[in-house]
Amino acid sequence: MHTAFSLTFLGLALGLASAEAISVTPHEQFSSSVGVLGCLINTNRVAYFPSSPSCDKPCVRLTDKEHGREVTVLHIDSSAGAHDISYDAWNYLKTGKSAKEDPQQGNGIDVEMEQITLDDSECKALLTGSNGKIPVMAKSPQWGMECPKDAVEFYNIGTSTCTTGTKEKCEVSGDKVDCPSGDAGASGQLEGMSVKNIEYGTGKEVDAQ
């Protein structure tokens, strides 16, 4: 009986140790310092945290125990110090509703943070247009090249907001990335794949810059 109790207590302690208490704040403008493409992910579920993005555990599960709400976000950009998340994700934690439906304003929300792997179904669900892999710009491949091959896909798209380029997959060849259209493929205007931001306080969708 004593051993069983000890093991149970140890399991609870390890579970608590894996979660970190933070305060999350709203972030309106989509961006990615590691070249992840907004048109191929759910940009309403992105994390902008002080730590560097990890391709081993790219997603973060945030739990607001006070209100019983939980949201999973994709960590693909760094911040100067704040734990920012997409405005829509923050609004959901605050109200249980999308920012498009019930836009709110405010400050930090206290949550518990747990990093999760790409194999997690909620993490994969955020990669809406890239077969469950992290979509990265071929012209800025440095971060993606450090990831396991089965974790990323490279595309010949010239900006993280998908304003230029060609929606074609590129292949890793040695220490570089080769695209069917070559480097020039990333420079032309890309139609129909614009990234939207949800405007803070109004809930209106606007084109990301």
Q: What annotation goes with each model-predicted range?
A:
Residues 2-58, 71, 78-82, 87-209:
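Mature exported/compartmentalized surface modules and terminal targeting/interaction regions
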